[in-house]
């Protein structure tokens, strides 16, 4: 197995990563960490009082794991029917089936650090989105 110190962008090769450390060290809003043929891992850093933005992935299931901070997570069949939100903390996981509207808001006082697994991949390999315009 590849245990490369610079794991991000391993091009779908088998690899071992300290995903908690990689997630905590990430300062980009979104950074692709690994992309295979059927799955992808991204790291996110969401500033206080910001969110990922209401979104839906029609053809991708998603697992979002909170590594640092606390969040409010909303789900719904439509954008207008999203629930008021459930509290999620470090160590919690959000399981989001394809076709589900969702949003994750940083409700804490420190940056929210999460990693996300998409199946199949959702973002282009090598994606780095340094910031998000926060309109929240």
Residue ranges and their predicted role:
Residues 32, 41-45, 63, 85, ...:
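Conserved hydrophobic/aromatic beta-strand scaffold that supports enzyme active sites
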Residues 43, 73-75, 114:
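Short hydrophobic/aromatic-rich beta-strand segments that constitute the beta-sheet cores
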Residues 59-77:
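Glycine- and acidic-residue-biased ligand/ion/polar-headgroup-sensing regions
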Residues 78-98:
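Short acidic-glycine-tyrosine-enriched beta hairpin
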Residues 6-10, 21-24, 80, 105-136:
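Double-stranded beta-helix
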Residues 52-54, 73-74, 96, 102-109:
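Short beta-strand His + acidic residue motifs that chelate non-heme Fe in jelly-roll/DSBH
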Residues 1-40, 53, 86-90, 130-136:
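A short, N-terminal "cap"/entry segment at the start of jelly-roll beta-barrel domains
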């Amino acid at each position: 197995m590849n245990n490369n110190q610079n794991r991000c962008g391993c091009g779908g090769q088998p690899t071992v990563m300290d995903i908690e450390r990689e997630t905590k060290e990430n300062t980009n809003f979104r950074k692709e960490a690994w992309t295979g043929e059927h799955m992808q891992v991204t790291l996110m850093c969401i500033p206080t009082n910001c969110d990922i933005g209401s979104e839906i992935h029609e053809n991708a299931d998603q697992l979002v794991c909170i590594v640092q901070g606390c969040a409010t997570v909303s789900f719904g069949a439509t954008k207008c029917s999203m629930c008021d939100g459930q509290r999620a903390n470090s160590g919690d996981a959000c399981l989001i089936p394809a076709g589900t509207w969702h949003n994750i808001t940083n409700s804490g006082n420190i940056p929210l650090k999460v990693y996300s697994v998409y199946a199949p991949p959702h973002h282009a390999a090598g994606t780095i989105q340094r910031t998000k315009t926060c309109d929240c």
